Amino acid sequence: SEEDHAYYTFTPTVRLSYNLKKAGFLRYRFNISPAIPSLGSLTDVEQAMDTIQIVRGNPLLKTYQQFTNSLSYSYSKKQFNANLSVRHQYYDNPIMESIFVEDGKLILKDENQRSFQSLNTELMAGINGATLFGLKDFLTLYASGGYTRSWSEGLNYSHMYDEFYYSVMAQVQYKDFSLLGQFRKVQNNFFGETIKKNENQTAFMAMYT
C-alpha cells in the first residue's frame, strides 16, 4: 500500500543590528528551519551497495528542527577590514545514520537520533589596496582562520570532533597587471558518524587589462 506524508513548516527569523559608529558594527541573527526527510529515505526497501553493505529505508523518519544563533562584529578603517563571528547550531532529533551488523551484513539506516550541535568561531582580517614601495593600491592581503567543535549524539553513539581551518589571499597590482595567489585549508564535513574529507585548495592567477 502507498503511504502519504504531509509536512508543515515554520521558519521564523530574527535579525538585530547595532552601529557602534567608529567602533564597528554588531549583527545578530536567529532562525529556525525544518529539515524534511527525503523520499528515498522514507521508502521501506533495502538496497545493496556491494556484497557487504546494505542501505535500509525508514518510513518512520520525522521532520526535525535546526536552530541557528550567529553573532558577528565587523570593523573598517581606511584600508583595514576585520570581522569576528560566532555561530552555534543545534539540531533536535536530527536524521543521522545508524550503522550495525545483521546476518553478516553492514546495515546503514537513517534514524532520528538524539541531537547534533556545532560551535564555530572565525576571524578575518585584511588590508585592501594598500600603498607599498610608493606604489598606490599595490597590495591587497586577507587572512582568516576558524575553529569548529561538533557534538553528535546518536541513539547508540556519542562523538565529538574538533577542527581548525584557515585561508590566505594576496594580490599585487601595478598599472594594468595584477597577480593573485590563494591557499585554503578547507573544513571537513562531520555529521552523525561520518567525516567527509575535503581537499585543500591552492590558486594562482595573473591578469592584464
Regions found by a protein language model. Give the residues of each.
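Flexible, solvent-exposed coil segments and beta strand-coil junctions
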Residues: S1, A6-Y8, D44-V55, S98-L108, ...
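Transmembrane beta-strands of outer-membrane beta-barrel pores
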Residues: E2, F30-I36, V45-E46, F67, ...
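Secondary-structure transition into beta-strands, especially the periplasmic turns and strand N-termini
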Residues: Y18-L26, Y75-N83, G129-L141, K175-S178
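Outer membrane beta-barrel strand-and-loop segments of large Gram-negative receptors
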Residues: R56, K62, N81-M169
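Residues on the lipid-exposed face of transmembrane beta-strands in outer-membrane beta-barrel proteins
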Residues: V14-Y18, L71-Y75, V86, T121-T131, ...
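Surface-exposed extracellular loop regions of Gram-negative outer-membrane beta-barrel proteins
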Residues: S1-N19, K22-F67, H88-K105, E111, K136-Y147, Y166-N189, E199-M207
